[in-house]
Structure formats: structure tokens, C-alpha cells
Swiss-Prot record:
Belongs to the cucumovirus capsid protein family. It comes from Cucumber mosaic virus (strain DKRD). It comes from the Viruses. GO terms for cellular component: ribonucleoprotein complex; T=3 icosahedral viral capsid; viral nucleocapsid. Keywords: Acetylation, Capsid protein, Ribonucleoprotein, RNA-binding, T=3 icosahedral capsid protein, Viral nucleoprotein, Virion. This is Capsid protein.
Amino acid sequence: MDKSGSPNASRTSRRRRPRRGSRSASGADAGLRALTQQMLKLNRTLAIGRPTLNHPTFVGSESCKPGYTFTSITLKPPEIEKGSYFGRRLSLPDSVTDYDKKLVSRIQIRINPLPKFDSTVWVTVRKVPSSSDLSVAAISAIFGDGNSPVLVYQYAASGVQANNKLLYDLSEMRADIGDMRKYAVLVYSKDDKLEKDEIVLHVDVEHQRIPISRMLPT
């Protein structure tokens, strides 16, 4: 008797067929492999632009130019009366100024994005004559000439001052490290008295690399 047409044989034949679930899992695996390959390719592409010792990050937001690094200095203005001014020349460490012919490409000023005061403060960097005593009158005249961008830093209702950086490009001027003593950071306390150490300025000078490994950010 031929049993091929029996109910049991039909059930066995059906069990031998590939299940839809298996085909779906196989398709999902293939898709996952393709996605993994895409992610690996993207990761390799991004790695090319990541900061290294030869191409460090400029203040954590932008890569330095190839062959450049940066040196940071911190300034803490003293007490500044309402409507008054403060100025201080840039003073880089001796280990940097020993290489005074190395070119400087950019200067960046950063301020804490969480201000502890509710006044409005103007900050700028300017090249000033060596004869200037950075008196209140001299700084006032510099702010008034409108020849330099100014960082307006003030209280924000959210508690966060988003506009807390100002970048100066000196590459076309061919400025060098030796020229930095001719530049000064200037501050104007517009609306209220600024207490001592109430504002901290971080000045980052991007310059050609010098042969001191400890100067390179990691």
C-alpha cells in the first residue's frame, strides 16, 4: 500500500520545508552585518579627523591646523567698578616665548558659560602700542573705535551663557609668538561692579609646534 498520501507523510513533508522564521532571521542577520560594515567604515572615516598629538583639538571644539598646537593662559581681572575698564597684556610662559619666531594663527577667549554675576561684560583682544599704559582712558578709546570684535557676556535667564567664546584669526597678519606681548585682553564692566575673581578668562594661543612635548594637549 502506498503511504505517500497518508496524513503522516504530509505532515513530515511540511516539517521539512524551511520555516518563515528561519528566513526572517537570516535576512535580519544579513542586514545587521551590512549595518555593522557601514558603521565600521564610518568609524574609520571619522578617525582620520580625530585629534592626535600632531593635530590636537583646539579648545575641545575644533582641531588645530596641521603642525600647530596651543598654549592656554588664565586671567582673573581684579575688582572693576561699574563703567570702568581693565586691561592686561598677553604673557606666555618662557618655555614658549623662547621660540618667538613661531607663527601664531589664532587667539581664542573663553569664559565660564555659567556666569555668577548679572552684569554685562565686554571682552576683546587688541594689539596695543608698547607705550600704552592700558589706563582707563586708553582702553575706553580702544573699545570706542569699533575696530575689533567684542564678546558681549551677560546674565542669561536660563543660567547658561551660550555665547562664551571669541576667536581672532591672525594667520593673514603673519603674527608670531614674539608679537603676543603687543596684544592685550581688555574688559569693560558695563552695568555693575565686577568683584575680584568673579570672572575668569581663558586665553588660548594657537601657534606652530615647538619641541616641548609637555606643551601638547592630550
